[in-house]
Regions:
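FNR/FR-type flavoprotein reductase catalytic core
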Residues: 1-61, 129, 134-216
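Ferredoxin-reductase
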Residues: 58-152, 193-195, 199-202, 212
């Protein structure tokens, strides 16, 4: 909505937590009023899903430990960060996204809350690369990211490109939205003809130069 760009991510999340609290209170109210036994599983299932959301996703119980291995400047307001797994890596595919929490470093403030980022590269050894543009409070802090920072990663999620090569296609991207397509192109030759239309500003020309090389 029109208000979304004006809300800090932390405040936006707290608003959603208030909604979750309202749902929990509503379920508790139904239990107090009394439910038929065969309907009792409905609020119980909802509470279990809410607990999984809190513990598994928001608190990172399902997250894997990574470390920032390299950071590359991509124009005036973007970076690419390569992350190396400390245990097992994610079984990710191009077109997917992950939830990432960046912790503090010697000269880096950190963004300990989990934020979504689309993968811009996926390596066979478990390393993943994220394209990060300064669009909000956390992503602005991440422009100062440095190697060695501890990271927690959840996912991967999504099936954006799973059926993209079943027939010839047209891919359209703008700015940092190129990352899922770039992740696929970095894997090697496509299996079907695809036309890519990429709209970008001069500050994002670093990706355009690489795309020219991949298309050659």
């Amino acid at each position: 909505g029109a208000m979304a760009p004006r809300l800090a991510y932390r405040f936006w999340r707290r608003l959603h937590w208030l909604l979750a609290l309202a749902v929990a209170l509503g379920l508790a109210h139904l239990l107090v009023l009394g439910l038929d036994a065969f309907l009792l599983w409905v609020p119980l299932l909802a509470l279990l899903l809410l607990a999984w959301r809190v513990l598994g996703a928001d608190r990172g119980w399902s997250a894997l430990p990574y470390v920032v291995e390299a950071v590359q400047r991509m124009g005036d307001d973007g970076i690419e960060a390569r992350l190396r797994p400390l245990t097992r890596g994610l079984a990710a595919r191009p077109g997917q996204f992950v939830l990432v929490a960046f912790f503090r470093g010697p000269h880096f403030r950190g963004c300990a809350e989990f934020h979504p980022f689309t993968l811009s590269d996926v390596a066979a050894d478990g390393r993943i690369t994220l394209g990060i543009k300064a669009l909000g409070d956390c992503t602005r802090h991440l422009q100062a990211l440095e190697p060695g920072v501890a990271v927690r990663v959840q996912g991967p999620f999504g099936r954006f490109l799973d059926e993209a090569e079943k027939e010839p296609g047209l891919w359209i991207a703008g700015g940092i939205g190129i990352t899922p397509f770039l992740a696929r192109l970095r894997q090697g030759a496509l299996t079907v003809p695809v036309r890519l239309v990429y709209l970008y500003r001069a500050a994002e020309a670093a990706y355009a130069a690489e795309l020219d090389g991949l298309a050659a």
